[in-house]
Amino acid sequence: VPGPFDAWLVLRGLKTLAIRMERHCRNAAVIAAHFERHPNVAQVLYPGLPTHPGHKLAASQMRDFGGMVSLLVRSEEQSIAAVGRTKIWKLAESLGGVESLIEHPARMTHASTADAPFAAPKNLIRLSVGIESADDLIEDLEQALVRSHSASVSG
């Protein structure tokens, strides 16, 4: 049973939920579209993209496409380096907050399935997109990908 203060926090948060979700989803769509054309990204996984294999189904079931975006980059080394080079994106294993989070699932949330047939790809980066400026988030992720690509090529 939640206490009175916890209940008050939930009630207060509900007042801004719609605007936060709108921004969360819009930012994810902008980021997914941007990185779909990025030379260091092999594939973007986001159901809001028309190129996603589940786009039609998602569009028939959802008003919006959420704030989770996954990137398959060129190598495991690049993915590990990139998640450690962001300044705005926080390296964390959570989702659903207002802040943007980045993780390397193969070493973090899905490490226990590393040898399974359904294991997370080692070159996968997972993003939980927050409500910060989409331009700032893109710029931060851009610099991390460029620096990580340079490091993986030279190292």
Regions found by a protein language model. Give the residues of each.
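PLP-dependent enzyme catalytic core of the Aspartate aminotransferase-like
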Residues: 20, 100-155
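Active-site C-terminal subdomain of aminotransferase-like
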Residues: 1-68, 72-106
